[in-house]
Regions:
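Transmembrane alpha-helices of multi-pass small-molecule transport proteins
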Residues: 31-89, 116-117, 164-167, 185-202, ...
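Hydrophobic transmembrane alpha-helices of multi-pass small-molecule transport proteins
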Residues: 47, 120, 124, 129-148, ...
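C-terminal transmembrane-helix exit sites in multi-pass transporters
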Residues: 94-96, 112-134, 147, 252-271
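Hydrophobic alpha-helical transmembrane segments of multi-pass membrane transport proteins
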Residues: 11-19, 23, 79-100, 146, ...
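Membrane-interface helix-cap regions at the ends of transmembrane helices
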Residues: 44-72, 139-153, 190-211, 256-266, ...
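Glycine-/small-residue-enriched transmembrane alpha-helix faces in small-molecule transporters
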Residues: 1-38, 50, 85, 93, ...
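C-terminal-most transmembrane helix of multi-pass membrane proteins
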Residues: 40, 144, 151, 212, ...
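Alpha-helical transmembrane segments of compact multi-pass small-molecule transporters, enriched
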Residues: 16, 42-46, 109-123, 190-194, ...
Length: 303
């Protein structure tokens, strides 16, 4: 398979995120904002350290940025600051829904997200889809409709979570030649700066449990930095619509955990809907034109 490493990176990232609720639930007695604060601040510190040890990369990318056209510079800045903003919104709403609504509701958000990402990639990036892929998208929409039919509140929360991440994926698609890890570092640091003014006002009592800080450290490294970098790596050559559909892996893993580990109730309607969504993932990738045509590096497009 062409671009096997990029497919593998995307699959690994979304599988890791599927287990997020397993790590997050032990922190359920902490406010969503507190978890978000410490997660982002911890990630920002680690990313700042990494930038310090990669000053040569920083200098190279600074020279690259100065050599770009005005339009491309604005594109890089939008990826940096817009990406940081969308990530912050996505993280907050996801944590809030997991700890205050249900794990299934958070999983549902990442069933809606692939549909939104695919449609946005088609509308904004003009990514062409085959008839078979549109059929797969329609099948996924029907599955989401079945799941959300009697759960309107869950559906609304899910759309907010999904839209924030779908927009993040779409705006990261174009490759301006910048170092992906450096871009991610800037996004996380910007997210921390966005949250910093709110910390003194909205924070709760300073956590005293050692387990809290160990869990946050684990989340910062293995559930934030690693999967986000894998995601950006995959976006170097895979289309946003392809990444969006592979994102279905996250809610499928989360759904299995919700039923088996958290013992949340499930009915035949949900099983049918999730089965339709699994089938849509298979069909979308089966009808992917990249399986039959040579891949074109995105770095050569738009240059």
């Amino acid at each position: 398979m062409r671009n096997f490493s990029h497919y593998l990176a995307a699959i690994a990232a979304f599988t890791i995120w599927g287990f997020f609720s397993l790590i997050l639930r032990p922190l359920a007695h902490y406010a969503a904002l507190d978890i978000l604060f410490y997660r982002v601040f911890g990630s920002a510190v680690l990313m700042s350290v990494s930038v310090f040890f990669r000053l040569s990369v920083w200098k190279e990318n600074k020279q690259l940025f100065m050599g770009l056209s005005g339009q491309d510079r604005r594109g890089v800045l939008f990826q940096l600051f817009g990406g940081g903003l969308f990530l912050t919104c996505n993280w907050f709403f996801y944590i809030y829904v997991v700890n205050n609504v249900s794990v299934k509701a958070s999983a549902f958000a990442y069933l809606v997200c692939p549909v939104l990402t695919t449609v946005l990639a088609w509308a904004i990036l003009k990514e062409w889809l085959t008839k078979g892929q549109w059929a797969a998208v329609l099948l996924s929409v029907i599955g989401c409709g079945i799941l959300g039919f009697h759960h309107l509140v869950d559906l609304l929360y899910s759309i907010v979570i999904a839209l924030s991440y779908a927009l993040y994926l779409v705006i990261q698609r174009k490759n301006y030649g910048t170092d992906r890890f450096l871009l991610l570092s800037g996004q996380v640091i910007f997210s921390a700066l966005l949250l910093l003014p709110f910390y003194p006002v909205y924070r709760g009592p300073v956590p005293a449990e050692t387990r809290f800080y160990l869990t946050i450290g684990f989340i910062a490294v293995f559930l934030t930095i690693v999967p986000l970098f894998l995601n950006l790596y995959a976006l170097k050559f895979l289309r946003s619509s392809t990444i969006g559909v592979l994102l279905n892996i996250t809610p499928l893993v989360a759904f299995v955990l919700a039923v088996t580990f958290f013992e949340e109730k499930v009915d035949a309607q949900q099983v049918i809907a999730y089965s339709m969504i699994v089938l849509s993932v298979v069909l979308f990738n089966w009808f992917n034109p990249a399986r039959r045509t040579p891949a074109v590096s995105n770095s050569n497009r738009g240059r």
